[in-house]
């Protein structure tokens, strides 16, 4: 079996490549399959599938849902999603509206301190794009407020920063069950990024399995061999499908 990438983002969320550019890059890299998993949306899937139609690559429709966990969120990737599924579309619109409300308030807070961030700039000419904190980071760099993305997140976009506005998440159960209802395969994304102890991770997976979780990312761009070995054993323990991806965002 050839190389696949089951976790990528496009300009329909916080990536810098359009869906068609993503397909072209995947083909040029010799990938056998690629999944588009934009945050909380499937709006880029039609362009993605069309771009791959005559290419020697399998294009997998997907998404990455942010679901509530403690005082933050965790991410559930959904692969092989029916992007036309009515229930999924409704839930996606609810999530996007919540994001928009949060983003508008964050932009207003920046403007009050004479940092002229607007929603028009954040969407960058693509009104269907799901705006994330990465979009804010780009503009903070553009306006010379910070030098790089890490500085933007540490000083201005972290939950402890005065510009940060929390948003309301859907529940873990709702996210997983909606992916399943749309014919998708729900997978816990980048489990080590949540900084949980082994006991906490196992407790979370026990709960998510009850809701229908089917897989976990055992390969990820920042994982060491030791990390991968650890998560692969966790996957076996919980009888979860091993998945993996780069979490490619283009130049972000």
Residue ranges and their predicted role:
Residues 1-72, 155-159, 170-252:
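An N-terminally biased module of ancient metal coordination in phosphate/nucleic-acid-related enzymes
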Residues 51-206:
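Extended substrate/RNA-proximal surfaces in nucleic-acid metabolism proteins
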